[in-house]
């Protein structure tokens, strides 16, 4: 079987590396980047389970960990967790570098994998069921002192501060309701409050928050990672899901059961649709107590360890911000 992969992010490179190791004929096609860090999306946060997946690629994950924290501050409240802040550009280079930048001919491949994320370049044949996107903007800054990991709820989203070592941070925000200029101003005000020594770089982008978009297999085109809608709406976490879905797809290609990949993704990530529905309610300022169980699952997947009181606190903050 000959496999073409379009998109050289986490999902695309992970799939490429596994299939090459297993002896498949596989080509990886990259996309032109417009950011200083040469990645999109510009994310650095993940969790212990995801770090373990990195180890399965024959890569030493600890070499790419910038910092590890056992808590995060959410609207001023300290919540326990096991969180990793990674050097994503360096990790991507370690996973795969043999990348083509010409346009693939679909007829050259038995399977063409769309790993293009928000763009879904080759997935027009796949129904885009109730798609949902949020706008985000972010700055990488150098600070005078220690920075704590933090999230602060805003209307339709949140502001974040992600440590990249001891004196550097990724500071940004995103919303599914506010216009991009409003998000940019909130983030810029947040950055100014931190009084950074230097703003290293800045960028804006969209992120898919639709939940899984099925089917993920249509003829010879297959979606993976964000292209398949596999992003956790709470926190817009997509690194873990990108690794995991790529590994699942690699196993199904190896077993010659490509059609079984759709069922496997539904079984593993179907719960993300429930999280999407909760976020739809959040936008209206409505967060049911019945949603706490699903919210807990999402936060645990992202590396947090919230108590019931933590969940109730977050629920109240979401309702207040989205009145």
Regions picked out by a protein language model, each given a short descriptive name:
Residues 4-8, 18-40:
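Glycine-rich FAD pyrophosphate-binding loop
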Residues 8, 94-200, 213, 229:
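Predominantly flavin-linked oxidoreductase catalytic cores and closely associated redox partners
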Residues 12-13:
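N-terminal Rossmann-fold NAD(P) dinucleotide-binding loop
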Residues 31-72:
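N-terminal FAD cofactor-binding segment of flavoenzymes
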Residues 42-46, 77-94, 177-182:
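Short beta-strand to alpha-helix junction loop
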Residues 70-86, 164-175:
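Helix-loop-beta segment of a Rossmann-like dinucleotide-binding subdomain
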Residues 79, 99, 179-249, 253-254:
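FAD/FMN-dependent oxidoreductases across multiple families
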Residues 251-323:
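C-terminal helical "tail/cap" subdomain of flavin- and related membrane-associated enzymes
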């Amino acid at each position: 079987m000959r496999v073409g992969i379009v998109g050289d992010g986490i999902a695309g490179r992970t799939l490429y590396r596994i299939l090459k190791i297993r002896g498949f004929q596989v080509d990886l096609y990259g996309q032109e980047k417009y950011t200083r860090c040469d990645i999109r999306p510009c994310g650095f946060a993940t969790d212990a389970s995801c770090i373990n997946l990195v180890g399965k690629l024959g890569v030493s994950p600890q070499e790419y960990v910038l910092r590890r924290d056992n808590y995060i501050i959410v609207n001023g409240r300290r919540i326990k967790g096991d969180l990793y802040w990674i050097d994503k550009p360096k990790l991507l280079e370690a996973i795969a570098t043999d990348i083509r930048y010409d346009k693939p001919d679909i007829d050259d491949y038995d399977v063409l994998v769309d790993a293009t994320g928000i763009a879904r370049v080759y997935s027009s044949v796949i129904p885009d069921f109730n798609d949902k996107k949020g706008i985000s903007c972010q700055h990488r800054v150098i600070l005078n002192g220690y920075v704590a990991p933090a999230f602060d709820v805003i209307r339709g989203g949140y502001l974040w501060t992600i440590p990249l070592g001891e004196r550097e941070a990724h500071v940004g925000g995103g919303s599914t309701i506010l216009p991009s200029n409003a998000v940019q101003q909130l983030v810029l005000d947040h950055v100014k409050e931190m009084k950074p020594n230097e703003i290293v770089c800045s960028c804006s982008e969209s992120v898919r928050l639709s939940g899984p978009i099925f089917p993920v297999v249509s003829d010879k085109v297959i979606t993976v990672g964000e292209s398949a809608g596999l992003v956790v709406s709470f926190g817009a976490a997509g690194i873990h899901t990108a690794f995991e879905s790529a590994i699942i797809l690699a196993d199904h290609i190896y077993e010659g059961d490509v059609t079984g990949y759709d069922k496997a993704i539904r079984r593993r990530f179907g719960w993300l649709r429930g999280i999407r529905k909760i976020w739809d309610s959040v936008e209206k300022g409505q967060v049911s107590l019945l949603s706490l169980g699903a919210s807990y699952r999402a936060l645990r997947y992202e590396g947090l360890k919230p108590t019931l009181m933590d969940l109730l606190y977050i629920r109240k903050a979401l309702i207040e911000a989205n009145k």
